[in-house]
């Protein structure tokens, strides 16, 4: 089930739980497992993008629509054409165009695809090979389908080479995009190495040059996140497992103010883990 929380004071305000806004039983093409979702706004409507396994146990992206941010959200009858993997994050650029960033390896099934087509014998690259990239795709004006074929999101080192699969700062899952001082900040989770990292580019498609760590490891393996500007300040939303004693399936929402230095670099935040 998905819930919506709201507050008007990010650091100190009361949190309101608006209850269940979408559940598996509501979705016609459902198999099982709703994973991390995102919501975008356009023309008075709220569009929730969610990954879910279909009846063949393959992840697809779905869309559900509401007139209000607190829901309820009504799902479309079919998944988005050409969609796969997990962790959709939708970014609205200054010209009103919307882009979805998505993908996750291991259980997120990204390794099952090459050039947007399923392959018969999926495998992960060797440590000395380029890491599997996430994906980005422009959305159609109606927000319900892809406007084009998804593209690879390249994260490059200082020499212009793709980060290797054995690099602890390579992409794993949980893409996010925000814009600061005219630059595009791609952030993501490194999964099994437990960092939130970021890279900067000049346009929504990249390529993006690796910059550093946003958040050091937290308690538990749970570093999905969002970066949001609200009332003139920037915030990092993430989660950890402190209240559950480190049980990774029992996650608690966290927020911390995010700051930049004079050059636009994000100041690293201590996650409090090992």
Residue ranges, per PLM feature:
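Carbohydrate-active catalytic/glycan-binding domains of CAZyme proteins
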Residues: 1-274
